[in-house]
Amino acid sequence: MTNKRAYKALIQMLHQKRSTTEWDALLNDLLTPKERESLAERWQIIQLLASGMPQREIAKKLSLSISKITRGSRVLQQGRGGFKQALKKMKK
């Protein structure tokens, strides 16, 4: 299976409806602790940016470099819209 096909298969697998417990088990099996921490950190950055908090304040609050926050801001503004869709769905 090519990487492209494997990625599509992964997307299909992730699309299946799961409980919070099932998601936790899947992510624990799929990702290393560091990868899970990085994803949670990135999501926290996106949520704070979307709330209107200034980048420097986020960097200070999370003890992260301003470049990490700027990257999150750039993806939120110029990315493919995945974060915006997720934020919108969470508000419902």
Give the ranges of each region predicted by the language model.
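Short, amphipathic alpha-helical "recognition" segments used to contact nucleic acids or chromatin
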Residues: 39-53
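Short, solvent-exposed alpha-helical "recognition" segments
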Residues: 73-87
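General nucleic-acid-binding
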Residues: 1-15
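Short, Lys/Arg-enriched anionic-surface-contact patches
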Residues: 22-41
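Short alpha-helical "recognition helix" segments of helix-turn-helix
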Residues: 57-62
